[in-house]
């Protein structure tokens, strides 16, 4: 009983934090969280995936065959609806 209440309370707190971060003006928390989840060692990226998942911005572009995602600021494969 105590464990289930603790897990429920922890889940609600986590939900509150994510909702607050997504509604904040800066909206940096979800982006940093996703970037850290999908970030990997640079040797692994070059070996297995090319430059998929590299961080990018206006000045630092991506490898050929990839585009910079305007939302998440990492390199993705071009597809429908992506520039």
From Swiss-Prot:
What is the official name of this protein in its record?
A: U5-theraphotoxin-Hs1b 1
Q: What is known of its domains?
A: The presence of a 'disulfide through disulfide knot' structurally defines this protein as a knottin.
Pfam families in the cross-refs: Toxin_12 (PF07740)
Q: Where in the cell is it found?
A: Secreted
Proregion residues are: 22-49
Q: Which organism is it from?
A: Cyriopagopus schmidti (Chinese bird spider)
Q: What does this protein do?
A: Weakly inhibits 5HT3A receptors and Kv1.3/KCNA3 voltage-gated potassium channels. Agglutinates erythrocytes.
The record's tissue-specificity note reads: Expressed by the venom gland.
Q: Which UniProt keywords apply?
A: Cleavage on pair of basic residues, Disulfide bond, Ion channel impairing toxin, Knottin, Lectin, Potassium channel impairing toxin, Secreted, Signal, Toxin, Voltage-gated potassium channel impairing toxin
Q: Does the keyword NAD apply?
A: no
> What are the annotated disulfide bridges?
51-63, 56-68, 62-75
Q: Does the keyword Secreted apply?
A: yes
For this record, an example GO cellular component is: extracellular region
Tell me the GO molecular function terms: carbohydrate binding; ion channel inhibitor activity; potassium channel regulator activity; toxin activity
The record's InterPro entries line, in alphabetical order, gives:
Huwentoxin-1
| Residues annotated as signal peptide | 1-21
Lineage runs: Eukaryota, Metazoa, Ecdysozoa, Arthropoda, Chelicerata
Chief location of this protein?
secreted
Could you say which protein family the record assigns here? Belongs to the neurotoxin 10 (Hwtx-1) family. 51 (Hntx-8) subfamily. Hntx-8 sub-subfamily.
């Amino acid at each position: 009983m105590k464990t289930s209440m603790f897990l429920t309370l922890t889940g609600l707190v986590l939900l509150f934090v994510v909702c607050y971060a997504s509604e904040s003006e800066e909206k940096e928390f979800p982006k940093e969280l996703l970037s850290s989840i999908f970030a990997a060692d640079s040797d692994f990226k070059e070996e297995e995936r090319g430059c998929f998942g590299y961080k990018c911005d206006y000045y630092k572009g991506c490898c050929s065959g990839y585009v910079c995602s305007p939302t998440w600021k990492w390199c993705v494969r071009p597809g429908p609806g992506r520039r």
